[in-house]
């Protein structure tokens, strides 16, 4: 079995760089909408579980409601959430773990399928403008 982990900040902290243009409620709504878009893609991958790691109960409720496995984040920040998912994957004997930030735009099941079937111990997907990575 394999898993895709989606680490999500607390809705109170999410999309902080947009604080000057969006209210806290708008940032929370944007975060949840983007999470749902990514869940639409990840939940279509056969043989892959989707885990949502977050300290935010609302995020975990959305994840569970959509069919993903909610994982209460034990300790922020992002690197610790990823480490938590790695440890969980190891304890469950998973064959593979992918980490995908849930605010990655325009994710499709087809693109994820190509990425997760790429051979190699580590796969990075560069952003279209090559200023970062998305997977």
Report the location of each language-model feature.
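A short, N-terminal amphipathic alpha-helix
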Residues: 29-47
């Amino acid at each position: 079995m394999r898993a895709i982990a989606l680490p999500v900040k607390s809705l109170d902290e999410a999309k902080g760089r947009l604080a000057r243009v969006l209210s806290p409620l708008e940032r929370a709504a944007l975060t949840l909408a983007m999470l749902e878009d990514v869940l639409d893609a990840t939940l279509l991958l056969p043989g892959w579980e989707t885990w949502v790691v977050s300290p935010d109960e609302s995020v975990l409720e959305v994840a569970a409601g959509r069919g993903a496995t909610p994982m209460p984040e034990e300790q922020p920040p992002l690197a610790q959430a990823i480490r938590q998912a790695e440890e969980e994957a190891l304890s469950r004997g998973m064959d593979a773990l992918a980490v995908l930030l849930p605010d990655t735009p325009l994710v499709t099941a087809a693109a994820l399928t190509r990425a997760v079937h790429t051979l190699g111990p580590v796969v990075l997907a560069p952003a279209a403008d090559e200023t970062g990575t998305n997977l």
